[in-house]
Design a protein with these regions (language model features):
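Non-heme Fe(II)-dependent double-stranded beta-helix
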Residues: 1-30, 36-131, 137-139, 263-273, ...
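Non-heme Fe(II)/2-oxoglutarate
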Residues: 1-13, 61, 174-179, 213-218, ...
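Short, charged/polar surface micro-motifs in flexible loops or helix N-caps
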Residues: 98, 123-125, 154-157, 169, ...
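Active-site region of the double-stranded beta-helix
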Residues: 108-109, 135, 151-161, 166-168
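A generic structural micro-feature
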Residues: 127, 140-142, 232-236
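Glycine-rich phosphate/pyrophosphate-binding beta-alpha loops
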Residues: 134-136, 145, 226-231
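Short, conserved beta-strand element in jelly-roll/cupin
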Residues: 139-156, 210-211, 218, 243-247
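Double-stranded beta-helix
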Residues: 157-224
Length: 282
C-alpha cells in the first residue's frame, strides 16, 4: 500500500437519530461520515440472529455468495434482500431508527428503502472487498442515495473499511467489479475498470473508520470504498449495509447487468423508484 491511512473523525448523536450539523457537513464534504452509538444492543442482537438464519438458509438463496480461498480457515459470505424473507431484518428496517438517520444525513424529506446487504468475514479469510462505488451497480440517478453501514462486531483498523475522501465529487466513472473474483458482470459500458486506490499514484487521501457494535458509517453512492480481508484470529467482521433513496433520485434504465438484479415493478426511466420491491418509508 502506497497511500498513508488517516482515521475518520467520528461524531456522537445530539439526540436519537439526529446527528450534529458538523457530521452532516462532513458527509457532504468527504462523502462519508462515522457515527457512534447509532443502534442499541437490542437491535444489534436482533441483526446477529437474523444473520445466523441467513447463513443457515443460504443454500436455498440465489442471492447468497460464499467466497473461500484455498488454505484460508474462514470465508467471506454475503447476501441481499434478507428483509423480504427474514423477520429480524424486516423489523430493523421498518421499526428501528435507521431510516430517520439516513433521511437526516441526506437532508431528505422523503425516503425509499432500496435494499439490505449483509457481509460476514470470518476469522482468517483473506478475501478482500475490492475498490468500488455503489452507483456503478445500480439502475439509479440522483445524489440523495446513501449506504448506511452498521457494525455488529468490534472493527479495528485491520478489518475496517477504507474510503477515498471526496471521491463522490469526482466526475469520472468506472465499471463495477464483482466481489467474487471468479465472476463478471455482463454488457458493461466501454469505460475503465476501477483502479486500485491503495497503489494508484496521486494525492488522494484514504481514510479508515474503526467501529464498535452499533456504530454506523453513512456514505454517498459515489464514494470509492474497499475493505481488507479479516486477518483477526478469533473475531468475525459482521456488518449490515442498508441503502436509502431520497428526494432527487429517479430510475435509470441501464442496459448492463445490475446488482442486485431486481428492477422493481412498473418503473419508468426518469420516474420514481417507489414500488413494492423498493417501498416508501417516509
Amino acid at each position: 500500500m502506497n497511500q498513508d491511512l488517516v482515521q475518520l473523525s467520528s461524531y456522537e448523536f445530539e439526540s436519537i437519530s439526529i446527528p450534529p450539523a458538523d457530521a452532516i457537513e462532513a458527509y457532504e464534504r468527504d462523502g462519508v461520515v462515522s457515527l457512534r452509538g447509532a443502534f442499541s444492543e437490542e437491535w444489534i442482537e436482533l441483526l446477529a440472529h437474523g444473520m445466523e438464519i441467513a447463513i443457515s438458509d443460504s443454500l436455498k438463496q440465489d442471492t447468497a455468495f460464499n467466497i473461500s480461498t484455498p488454505g484460508d480457515p474462514g470465508f467471506f459470505f454475503y447476501d441481499t434482500f434478507m428483509w423480504q424473507r427474514i423477520n429480524q431484518f424486516k423489523r430493523f428496517v421498518f421499526e428501528s431508527n435507521v431510516a430517520d438517520i439516513a433521511a437526516n444525513v441526506m437532508r431528505s424529506k422523503g425516503l425509499i428503502f432500496y435494499f439490505d446487504f449483509m457481509l460476514v468475514k470470518e476469522p482468517g479469510t483473506s478475501s478482500k472487498t475490492p475498490w468500488h462505488y455503489d452507483e456503478a451497480y445500480w439502475p439509479i440517478k440522483g445524489n440523495q442515495i446513501c449506504n448506511l453501514w452498521i457494525a455488529l462486531d468490534h472493527i479495528p483498523i485491520e478489518t475496517a473499511l477504507r474510503f477515498v475522501i471526496g471521491s463522490h465529487r469526482w466526475a469520472k466513472s468506472y465499471n463495477p467489479v464483482h466481489f467474487d473474483p471468479d465472476m463478471y458482470y455482463a454488457d458493461l459500458p466501454n469505460i475503465p475498470p476501477m483502479p486500485d486506490w491503495d497503489v494508484e499514484p496521486g494525492d488522494h487521501k484514504i481514510a479508515f473508520a474503526p467501529m464498535d457494535p452499533g456504530d454506523c458509517l453513512v456514505f454517498n453512492r459515489r464514494t470509492f470504498h474497499s475493505a481488507p480481508g479479516n486477518s483477526l484470529k478469533t473475531s468475525s467482521r459482521r456488518a449490515l449495509a442498508t441503502h436509502w433513496i431520497g428526494d432527487d433520485v429517479t430510475y435509470n434504465d441501464k442496459a448492463h447487468e445490475t446488482d442486485p438484479p431486481y428492477r422493481g415493478e412498473g418503473l419508468v426511466h426518469g420516474g420514481s423508484m417507489e414500488c413494492a420491491t423498493f417501498p416508501r418509508v417516509r
